[in-house]
Amino acid sequence: MAKNDYVEIMEKNHMEIPWHDYTGNDSEVLIQQAGLIEKASVVGRVGLIMLSCGTGAWRVRTSMNRLSKELGVTCTVDVGLMSIEFNCFDGKECVSQSLSIANTGVNTSKLYRMEQFVDSFPSREAHLTGEEIHKRLDEIEQIHALYSPVKLGLAAALACCGFTFLLGGGPVEMIFAFIAAGVGNLIRMKLIKHHYTLFLNIAVSISAACLTYAVCLHMAELLFHISAVHEAGYICSMLFIIPGFPFITSGIDLAKLDLRSGLERLTYSIIIVLVATMFAWIMALLLKLQPQDFAALHLGNMTHLFLRLIASFCGVFGFSIMFNSSVYMAATAACIGAVANTLRLELVDFTRMPSAAAAFIGALTAGLLASIIKRNHGYPRISLTVPSIVIMVPGLYLYRAIYNFGIMSLTEAVSWFAAAIMIIVSLPLGLIFARILTDRTFRYCT
């Protein structure tokens, strides 16, 4: 093998698919009259773009099925986290393809545009040639990040600042978490932009967030005589790393018995959590930080309720922007999250309801509200529900579980871990039952 060929392979482990080679550039044959290979290329590419947006297997398969029916072919699909295997039949021939993406992520703006493409396909794209359809898909595929790394750093800062208050932190912890999370996610986005590997960007961004928080705390002690009791907020500064989308979509996939996709997404989420919490624990040992309880805020009930609404709105808005939502879509998700998360917290405080049960009700509420809004605005349901309940994911519990495992305080570790697992299971369950109640296509086993 020539040296240049070797370098080219090393530069891109996943080779790009020449989609336009499946069609004749000068062909005027409409896609409905085209051959099976050309039809399969359109169906497969639509599924692959949907998969790259972070949506679950059920939505990917549904989109591919809708296009297949319109093109007069039968399609069977097996979907994973990073790849799709599918077969297309037209009664005479069969085409089998295995497609994969180079990396996984979340892009709700691209997902929204793809859902519009699928919805309009019978009336618009079905009357075009394969080449024209691929050109339109080229345009959609170019929808990358809507925001610069600096803006995404600010979004993470806002989200973690709101998260800090909701977990019991005060103004000092909120300010430090804002700065540290902003720095951490800014570095993370820079690393992602340059295609650094997953483990490296998690380790560096988490370490940077912890270090920034510790520096801010130390400077505040020296300059303003701030008490070291505020060190507890360092946990909140790294909650931007929570893999909310794969966590929730894994539960939805498992509910539809898409076991391959569900287990792969769950594994991916666990990898992120383990790497993040391990490096956070190491940084805590090096910087002598401890996950203490927050100091009491002594707020009145109505004041606390009002501030929880604001903090929940800010937290969900920040996470939604991080998922590449438009500002209006992010604000819509934030309104849902403000209602659902505040309801969850109030149920825990005033009815002594177990946290897991309250999380189920909060997620159910978010799912019902998202279904109502989807009917009126057409936003992808998952683009509203996942950001609105990411703020309910018990990142603090998961970190404390790993921290206590690290110091061999096993009883404490198991207690925190059990509480986290109960809440994590309850969140997708709430969304699933909301979907069952409001979506007849999801309700039945087909």
What are these model-derived regions, one by one?
Residues 220-229, 287-301, 404-415:
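Membrane-interface helix termini and inter-helical loops of multi-pass transporters
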Residues 233-238, 249-253, 257-273, 335-341, ...:
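C-terminal transmembrane helix-loop-helix hairpin of multi-pass membrane proteins
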Residues 166-180, 229-243, 295-311, 351-364, ...:
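Structural signature of hydrophobic alpha-helical transmembrane segments
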Residues 131-144, 158-169, 188-196, 286-300, ...:
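Short juxtamembrane and helix-loop transition motifs at transmembrane-helix boundaries
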Residues 1-134, 139-141:
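Soluble N-terminal domains of membrane-associated systems
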Residues 146-249, 321-323, 327, 332:
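Core alpha-helical transmembrane segments of integral membrane proteins
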Residues 249-319:
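Membrane-embedded hairpin module used as a gating/binding unit in multi-pass transport
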Residues 150-154, 174-179, 200-204, 266, ...:
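Hydrophobic alpha-helical transmembrane segments
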